[in-house]
UniProtKB/Swiss-Prot annotation:
Residues 5-195 form the Glutamine amidotransferase type-1 domain. This is GMP synthase [glutamine-hydrolyzing]. Pathway: Purine metabolism; GMP biosynthesis; GMP from XMP (L-Gln route): step 1/1. The lineage of its organism: Bacteria, Bacillati, Bacillota, Clostridia, Eubacteriales. Catalyzes the synthesis of GMP from XMP. The active site is at 82 (nucleophile), 169, 171. Pfam families: GATase, GMP_synt_C, tRNA_Me_trans. It comes from Clostridium beijerinckii (strain ATCC 51743 / NCIMB 8052) (Clostridium acetobutylicum). The keyword ATP-binding applies. Gene3D superfamilies: 3.30.300.10, 3.40.50.880, HUPs. ATP binds at residues 223-229.
Length: 510
């Protein structure tokens, strides 16, 4: 199916995938390309709009990322954000300098409401700033359309050439008018209509996989989580019983999860499911390991080795399915962005693995994955399962992993999830879980001194996992969860609640 396309040019900002997410919320498909993509390649893609992302560099830095100036002569609307805004100004003859006062965080912005970019935005508002340099003087032919107290060019436009730049991050939720501004760029300036939907995505992906695989055999890394479940269903609809799902029970799952996954997928989906119990193998490899990156690498390595062994038992296997999604990719780092932490679906893959990968969801954000799942008829209870990392409880037990610690966090997590569901908060909170932060503290229980583990509770609200706020769970629910865990889980005498947003923290502790 032919779609209108917006290209997002990656200059290394951590919000790059979020920009793509916001464009898709406008009902338009977009792709992210590296900054050194040639003009010829850009022309071949025939984009209807181009967005330059932010990035950590200065336009005056050595080997700073840039683009060919010809991109501004294609007749395609361009929107620069933060560094992308500064780069546009620099390349077109404006003046970029070190700001006398840096702007970080929420900032009051005055906008020119006569600009097409700010059409329908009735009042000035708060925008999210994060910059050291700023545009001191806009290029010739550009008009200043927004300012702050310390930033003389918070936004600029060349309406005739349809070139626009904003110093603030329109893509983050903190910018009050950000989504409306992006809608104006996509619909009013680029002239695009809604053409991107999860129903059409699912149909196209099923067709694509059917053509790619043909009669070959496929092995699916099934965990029972939302991502792997939807990935498995797409491939199952494409090739039927030529898909074999391997469910690795590595001993790092949540309470009763292994039995639930096996029962649901065999009964409701009629898939070829093989459950492999290798808890001792994984725990043996992880014994004495405390570093979180090492844990992830070990788990990624063992996952692939288990699949290789099981594939030999199944017969000829040509492809491996993984539930990799967009945030997995951005958090594992790109050519221009710093690695935050290696994701198990990306950084943990051995270089000598013997399969070709099929990653049907790598273009999607979590809410899009859920929407595809609904389109495919996956039961609501599975589509809305809590996100669960591939390394499982290994990264929710900080420090060295033992069976005792796993049992503690498993039971505490089950209580937390049960009470959140009882309070009907399970679909309004993006993600919630318990973790064991490797902290012991003094307490008093039954008139006796204790020196026991601390459990940390984490709950966040988000729409895409790129940014999140800590969830404001009612105190009475937190109180109930705390009392239950302390009374019902042996070895715990203290409960803490994590009230850190992302950024600066990540959602998981490791």
């Amino acid at each position: 199916m032919k779609r209108d396309l917006v290209l997002v040019v990656d200059f290394g900002g951590q919000y790059n995938q979020l920009i793509a997410r916001r464009v898709r919320e406008c009902g338009v498909y977009c792709e992210i390309i590296p900054y050194d993509y040639t003009i010829e390649k850009i022309k071949a893609k025939n984009p209807k709009g181009i967005i330059f992302t932010g990035g950590p560099n200065s336009v005056y830095g050595e080997d700073t990322p840039t683009v060919e100036k010809e991109v501004f002569e294609l007749g395609v609307p361009v929107l620069g954000i933060c560094y992308g805004d500064q780069l546009m100004a620099h390349l077109l003859g404006g003046k970029v300098a070190t700001a006398p006062v840096r702007e970080y965080g929420k900032t009051n912005v005055k906008v020119d409401k006569s600009s097409k970019l700010f059409e329908g935005i009735e009042t000035d508002g708060i925008a999210w700033m994060s910059h050291t340099d700023y545009i001191e003087e806009a290029p010739k032919g550009f008009k200043v359309i927004a300012t702050t107290e310390v930033c003389p060019v918070a936004a600029m436009e060349n309406e005739e050439k349809r070139l626009y730049g904003v110093q603030f991050h329109a893509e983050v939720e903190h910018t009050q008018f950000g989504q409306k501004m992006l809608e104006n760029f996509i619909h009013n300036i680029c002239g695009l209509e809604n053409s991107w939907s999860m129903g059409s995505f699912a149909e196209e992906k099923i067709k694509e996989i059917k053509e790619l695989v043909g009669d070959k055999k496929v092995l699916c890394a099934l965990s029972g989580g939302v991502d792997s479940s939807v990935a498995a269903m797409i491939v199952h609809k494409a090739i039927g019983h030529n898909l074999t799902c391997i469910f690795v029970d590595h001993g790092l799952l949540r309470k009763d999860e292994g039995d639930t996954v096996e029962r649901v997928f065999k009964k409701e989906f009629d898939m070829n499911i093989k459950r492999v119990n290798v808890a001792d193998r994984f725990l043996g490899k992880l014994a004495g390991v405390s570093d979180p990156e090492t844990k992830r690498k070990i788990i990624g390595e063992e996952f692939i080795r288990v699949f290789e062994e099981e594939a030999k038992k199944v017969g000829q296997i040509d492809y491996l399915v993984q539930g990799t999604i967009y945030p997995d990719i951005v958090e594992s780092g790109t050519k221009t962005s710093a690695t935050i932490k290696s994701h198990h679906n990306v950084g943990g893959l051995p270089e000598d693995m013997q399969f070709e990968l099929i990653e049907p969801l790598r273009e999607l954000f979590k809410d899009e994955v859920r929407a595809v799942g609904e389109e495919l008829g996956i039961p609501h209870k599975l589509v809305w399962r809590q996100p669960f990392p591939g390394p499982g409880l290994a990264i929710r037990v900080l420090g060295e992993i033992t069976e005792e610690k796993l049992e503690i966090v498993r039971e505490a997590d089950a209580i937390f999830r049960e009470e959140i569901a009882n309070a009907n908060l399970d679909e309004s909170i993006w993600q919630y879980f318990a973790c064991l932060p490797n902290i012991r503290s003094v307490g008093v229980m039954g008139d006796e001194r204790t020196y026991s583990h601390t459990i940390a509770l984490r709950a966040v609200t988000s729409s895409d996992a790129m940014t999140s706020e800590w969830a404001r769970i009612p105190y009475e629910i937190l109180d109930l969860v705390s009392r239950r865990i302390v009374n019902e889980v042996k070895g715990v005498n203290r409960i803490v609640y994590d009230i850190t947003s992302k950024p600066p923290a990540t959602i998981e502790w490791e």
